[in-house]
A protein has these predicted regions:
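Hydrophobic, well-ordered beta-alpha structural blocks that scaffold small-molecule cofactor pockets
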Residues: 1-120
Length: 120
């Protein structure tokens, strides 16, 4: 329980710091655990989540107002950070972000410990 609360506090602190710098954070990956984590930490710093599944695109993360978009929009949205909700697929997603979507920002991997990877 204490570790979970520490993760929540650290994630909220990080997202607040990013927000104060007027930087954009969008999510990537819309598995069920994304809904759980967002409802745990709050949605106030996330505008969109990208997911490759056309079945999810255009819909919303359950219990939130966060819309799911096609990852091809990354090049137009130009987020500063991408919060990785499908952290168990981080290697594959990092490859996609760099090679297929030309993402040149930072990636936040929240679990098991918060890591920030600079893809620039």
């Amino acid at each position: 329980c204490e570790k979970t609360l520490n993760i929540k506090k650290n994630l909220l602190d990080l997202l607040e710091k990013i927000s104060k710098n007027n930087e954009k954070v969008y999510g990537y990956g819309a598995p069920a655990k994304a809904s759980t984590l967002i409802n745990f930490i709050g949605e106030n710093n996330l505008k969109y989540i990208y997911d490759k599944s056309s079945l999810k695109q255009g819909k919303f993360i359950p219990g939130t107002s966060i819309k799911i978009k096609n990852p091809s929009d990354i090049q137009y949205d130009k987020p500063d950070y991408i919060f990785l909700f499908a952290w168990n697929f981080s290697k594959e997603i990092i490859g996609d972000l760099k090679n297929n979507f030309s993402f040149k920002g930072k990636l936040i991997i929240p679990i098991p410990d918060i890591r920030i990877i600079d893809l620039d």
